[in-house]
């Protein structure tokens, strides 16, 4: 029978509920338990697929093709368990489900209300499909007091009564700010946050208190007294140097012990944290460092590239080097020479993106990397721009472009109109909806034997996650290969180009998929490990 941990947040947003949930999941997993993590998002979008990357951050894609919140990336990286579309739900999805049911007559003429219909939909989502797990950790998005989060709070309150006694625990993540003028940490914001949570009928079992310095014992006792939790259940969550320190830090503070005690599991099996200690040791004691330029379109919000950033650091862990990131807005290269920006870097990465803005700058970055023999990693849009660069400057395809940018006589990159997913033919048109209409999720690819990328994978058969509407036009394949660009990977039916490379370049690889989504600190993705290895070699030349 599954036990449930509900994680809420108070005082301010962006406290790190996702990291806290993921770290707790990793700790329980290290004790041998089977763990599932789920995210409940209060926004009215059906999913984040059409939301601006500079507002919402990264859209994390699962194997089964769901466009989800970036916190699911944290869940996967910390636990190694691949999430599914049933691990994330939004208010928009819930209301859509309810309205669809109402239109079908499923409610038999009843007046559809927030209670019980919305709350029941939320509860059904939380508890279904959990028979194979020991613990289900549910993160509630937003902050206590938000209007949008009210149905979720009511639903998890009801679940505290619906579930068998002793199978639900509430963890409240809060902030204890330091006031320089007073020279002390303040408990009042946490007190008020807990008071508001209690007014909703939820009594936290554990307080996880964020702070930038040690919380004095007297202040912990004060929180225990005023927030009605055991002194041992006031857990300090101090700032750490990197997020992979969090599981060990929380274990030292006793979070996992306290959660298990709240469930009455004593004595609990000891956690095996050796792999996490090795990761943290490699991060703390690098044997070198490299600088990677990320030439992107959404550099104003680094969360737009969250999995990418982490995957690069995973590559650093694999090579025992520190990875420094140089962020460059791609539009800069449309006005300025890229050389002064890129001459000193050890690798260039052009990530995914949408739309014409900044595309020429990415093409210039690809040309610089090709001509100067700097390691280049093009992901999704970054691969497409590298192919357009080759078409223009190597294959003499004047006007080579993408139909994403408008009509063109040389559509080197074009809209995918149809492809096969499973046994079903998927069809799209330029006039179709944007939401949920891309080539999404895991697809297989066949790599050409003897290519650099097949050597990196150690296989010619791979499966990676995709999120794109446009694809390199296979009609240009022969012309490009005659100029030295190798199409090293194709879809199994040979229709869709998946990877490209230059055999005479130290490391120039483009992939249509998103390998960053499958990288883990305990299991770095081979492409990122190889890219950072190549950058390390480049650092000895610069």
From Swiss-Prot:
ATP binds at residues 14-19, 71. GO terms for cellular component: cytosol. Coiled coil: none annotated. Residues 1-265 are annotated as: Amidoligase domain. InterPro entries: Class_I_gatase-like, CTP_synthase, CTP_synthase_N, GATASE, GATase1_CTP_Synthase, P-loop_NTPase. L-glutamine binds at residues 353, 381-384, 404, 469. Gene3D superfamilies: 3.40.50.880, P-loop containing nucleotide triphosphate hydrolases. The active site is at 380 (nucleophile), 514, 516. Allosterically activated by GTP, when glutamine is the substrate; GTP has no effect on the reaction when ammonia is the substrate. The allosteric effector GTP functions by stabilizing the protein conformation that binds the tetrahedral intermediate(s) formed during glutamine hydrolysis. Inhibited by the product CTP, via allosteric rather than competitive inhibition. Pathway: Pyrimidine metabolism; CTP biosynthesis via de novo pathway; CTP from UDP: step 2/2. UTP binds at residues 13, 186-191, 222. Catalyzes the ATP-dependent amination of UTP to CTP with either L-glutamine or ammonia as the source of nitrogen. Regulates intracellular CTP levels through interactions with the four ribonucleotide triphosphates. Homotetramer. This is CTP synthase. It comes from Rhizobium johnstonii (strain DSM 114642 / LMG 32736 / 3841). The lineage of its organism: Bacteria, Pseudomonadati, Pseudomonadota, Alphaproteobacteria, Hyphomicrobiales.
């Amino acid at each position: 029978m599954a036990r449930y941990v509900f994680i809420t947040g108070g005082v301010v947003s962006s406290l790190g509920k996702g990291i806290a949930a993921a770290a707790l999941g990793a700790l329980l997993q290290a004790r041998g338990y089977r763990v599932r993590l789920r995210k409940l998002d209060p926004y009215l979008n059906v999913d984040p697929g059409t939301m601006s990357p500079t507002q919402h951050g990264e859209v994390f894609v699962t194997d089964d093709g769901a466009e989800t919140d970036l916190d699911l990336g944290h869940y996967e990286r910390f636990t190694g368990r691949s999430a599914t579309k049933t691990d994330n739900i939004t208010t928009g999805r819930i209301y859509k489900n309810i309205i669809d049911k109402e239109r079908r007559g499923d409610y038999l003429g009843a007046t559809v209300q927030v209670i019980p219909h919305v709350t029941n939909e939320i509860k059904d989502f939380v508890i279904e499909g959990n028979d194979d797990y020991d613990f289900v950790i549910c993160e509630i998005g937003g902050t206590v007091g938000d209007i949008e989060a009210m149905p979720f709070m009511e639903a998890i309150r009801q679940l505290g009564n619906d579930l068998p006694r002793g199978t639900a625990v509430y963890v409240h993540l809060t902030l204890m700010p330091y006031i320089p003028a007073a020279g002390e940490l303040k408990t009042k914001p946490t007190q008020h946050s807990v008071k508001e949570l209690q007014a909703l009928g939820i009594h936290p079992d554990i307080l996880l208190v964020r702070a930038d310095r040690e919380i004095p014992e007297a202040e912990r006792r004060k929180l225990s007294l005023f927030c009605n939790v055991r002194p041992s259940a006031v857990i300090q969550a101090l700032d750490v140097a990197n997020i992979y320190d969090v599981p060990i830090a929380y274990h030292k503070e006793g979070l996992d012990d306290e959660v298990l005690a709240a469930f009455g599991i004593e004595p609990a099996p000891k956690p095996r944290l050796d792999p996490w200690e090795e990761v943290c040791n490699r991060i703390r004691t690098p044997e070198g460092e490299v600088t990677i330029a990320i030439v992107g379109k959404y550099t104003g919000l680094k969360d737009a590239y969250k999995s990418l950033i982490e995957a690069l650091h995973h590559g650093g862990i694999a090579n025992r080097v520190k990875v420094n990131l140089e962020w460059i807005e791609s539009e800069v290269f449309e006005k300025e020479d890229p050389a002064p920006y890129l001459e000193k870097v050890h690798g260039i990465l052009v990530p995914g993106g949408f739309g014409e803005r900044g595309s020429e700058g990415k093409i210039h970055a690809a040309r610089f990397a090709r001509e100067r023999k700097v390691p280049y990693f093009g992901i999704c849009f970054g691969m497409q721009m590298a192919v357009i660069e080759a078409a223009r400057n190597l294959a003499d395809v004047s006007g080579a472009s993408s139909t994403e940018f408008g009509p063109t006589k040389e559509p080197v990159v074009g809209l995918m109109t149809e492809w096969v997913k499973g046994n079903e033919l998927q069809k799209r048109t330029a006039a179709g909806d944007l939401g949920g209409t891309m080539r999404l999720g895991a697809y297989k690819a066949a790599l050409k034997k003897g290519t650099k990328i097949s050597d990196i994978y150690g296989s010619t058969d791979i499966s990676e996650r995709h999120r794109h509407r446009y694809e390199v036009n296979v009609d240009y394949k022969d012309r490009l290969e005659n100029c030295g660009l190798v199409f090293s990977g194709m879809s199994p039916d040979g229709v869709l180009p998946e990877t490209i490379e230059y055999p005479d370049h130290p490391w120039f690889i483009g992939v249509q998929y998103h390998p960053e989504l499958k990288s883990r600190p305990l299991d770095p993705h081979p492409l990122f490990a190889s890219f950072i290895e190549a950058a390390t070699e480049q650092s000895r030349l610069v």
